[in-house]
Amino acid sequence: MVLKSTSANDVSVYQVSGTNVSRSLPDWIAKKRKRQLKNDLEYQNRVELIQDFEFSEASNKIKVSRDGQYCMATGTYKPQIHVYDFANLSLKFDRHTDAENVDFTILSDDWTKSVHLQNDRSIQFQNKGGLHYTTRIPKFGRSLVYNKVNCDLYVGASGNELYRLNLEKGRFLNPFKLDTEGVNHVSINEVNGLLAAGTETNVVEFWDPRSRSRVSKLYLENNIDNRPFQVTTTSFRNDGLTFACGTSNGYSYIYDLRTSEPSIIKDQGYGFDIKKIIWLDNVGTENKIVTCDKRIAKIWDRLDGKAYASMEPSVDINDIEHVPGTGMFFTANESIPMHTYYIPSLGPSPRWCSFLDSITEELEEKPSDTVYSNYRFITRDDVKKLNLTHLVGSRVLRAYMHGFFINTELYDKVSLIANPDAYKDEREREIRRRIEKERESRIRSSGAVQKPKIKVNKTLVDKLSQKRGDKVAGKVLTDDRFKEMFEDEEFQVDEDDYDFKQLNPVKSIKETEEGAAKRIRALTAAEESDEERIAMKDGRGHYDYEDEESDEEESDDETNQKSNKEELSEKDLRKMEKQKALIERRKKEKEQSERFMNEMKAGTSTSTQRDESAHVTFGEQVGELLEVENGKKSNESILRRNQRGEAELTFIPQRKSKKDGNYKSRRHDNSSDEEGIDENGNKKDNGRSKPRFENRRRASKNAFRGM
């Protein structure tokens, strides 16, 4: 489903149903042509908010009941009355009449009682059962209105009389005689009962039903042109003081009843007679009014006349009706389906179609990309270049905005005729483009990379590379937005300019040449002491110091002649020499340590034994071997040595026997240690041997071991 929508001044107007939106078919035709209708996009995308919301030929009038649950419409052909039930979204019933309807009004809150003015001078009263009563008036009627206060029905006709029919008594009363012939429209003020009659001249007569006399006449002036015009419609606002009327030349007048001068005069724009005026008081926006002619229905502000929205169907409008409290409008028009419009900004959708709020955006008509998929847009200059000026105005060139649409195939043929080498040139350009792309993708050496040329503002590039890095600076140089700043001399930054100095009053030390020389880091106190110690160790520190003093004494005259800058440079040179010597010394130490580590190798067990055996006698060596073997047998332990001198000892733990004398002596020694006597015979301080208090709680886990 697709909803047609228009948007102006950020106000969306959705056409829910009507011409070019929905298309209904009889059930038997739909079943018979079921396969064909599957491919019919217009039928598949139809929207039917209310079922059978249409007439066989055209619709004349449409009104909504006061309770908002029903809608009554009249149309042709054949002349008939339709009543729609909003609760079921369908047609409740239809009735045929003898003559075509001119105007009607609903007497009850629902659809059960209504009065219809027909074009054969008859007035019909309809109720639930059908036609209740019919009467006639002397002349052809044009409009009618009902006064709820005194039950009078006022009928305007082609004569100079305003007919009165009292529905309580059931008889005609004396008519109101007007000064002019022909009453086009009659309306009544719901607040004070004032009656207004728009005549065939530019006069509106006001009558008081209570006194049955004329109250006043309102003469409408036409300052635009001097042509005669008629008053075609009238309407009172619910405040009782504001009155509006429409004319046959397409103008709407808004008056305050306390003055004879109009507050607003609004031109409809098409010159057709105004058919109806509706005050939009109970909607989301205030001070809005609807004026309708046969071409368009416009919504505008009654205070300043500013346009708000518009509804323009593709057929002529006969009548328009607003659903109170919502943003929905119904139109009776010269086509089979009646139109339904929905404006969300004016108010929500009615309760009986609350789903409309959620689906309007989803079903909104989107612009299709395939409409002009086979067409190409060309300007007027392109038309001249292609020698197609003789086709302007034909179907080949479809005018659109500032150019034309032309078929794509035709454009290719015409452009080939106008420029025979176009294909060849395009082919060469494409080949060149692909070759350049392949060259860019190849791996290049660092020397082959083309650096961006910097003609001006080199200092700015250096600052940028220091702050953000070379990568960011390179991107800035290649960016189309900024690269002219480093190529065009007009973008050169003038550092001597007054404004530049105001923004940059002081340069940092890093930006000056003297600062660059002073940026060499001085030696710390620890580094200077290390340097002096090494110099004294090598025996050159005192000599260098004396040489420096002698050189300074001999060159006193020369140094007095040198400037302060040269003295600073000599000091800097000395510091640089010291730093250089320190770096070389650390480098030598590192090389020596690496050489020592590479030369050092772990000796094997046999080599160590050979070195030791050179100072030990043969008998001692045999004794040691026997002791080792006896220890292995007794302890059942194994000692293994690898090539790097590492040893691995494997043994089985055993408890010493008490018979062993060594054990006793060792035990005795340990006991002496436990008693707290050291090697010199002094008593050791091993801490407190008894608790400070008896029966003191102990936190150890072995507290109950002695129990």
Swiss-Prot record:
Residues 532-544, 559-598, 629-647, 659-671, 680-697 have a biased composition (Basic and acidic residues). Keywords: Nucleus, Phosphoprotein, Repeat, Ribosome biogenesis, rRNA processing, WD repeat. Residues 523-707 are annotated as: Disordered. It is found in: Nucleus, Nucleolus. SMART domains: WD40 (SM00320). The keyword Phosphoprotein applies. WD repeats lie at residues 54-94, 178-217, 226-265, 269-310, 312-351. InterPro entries: Beta-prop_NOL10_N (IPR056551), NOL10/Enp2 (IPR040382), NOL10_2nd (IPR056550), NUC153 (IPR012580), WD40/YVTN_repeat-like_dom_sf (IPR015943), WD40_repeat_dom_sf (IPR036322), WD40_rpt (IPR001680). The modification Phosphoserine is found at S529, S550, S555. Pfam families: Beta-prop_NOL10_N, NOL10_2nd, NUC153. GO terms for cellular component: 90S preribosome; nucleolus; small-subunit processome. It comes from the Eukaryota. Belongs to the WD repeat NOL10/ENP2 family. May be involved in rRNA-processing and ribosome biosynthesis. Component of the 90S pre-ribosomes. This is Ribosome biogenesis protein ENP2. The gene is ENP2.
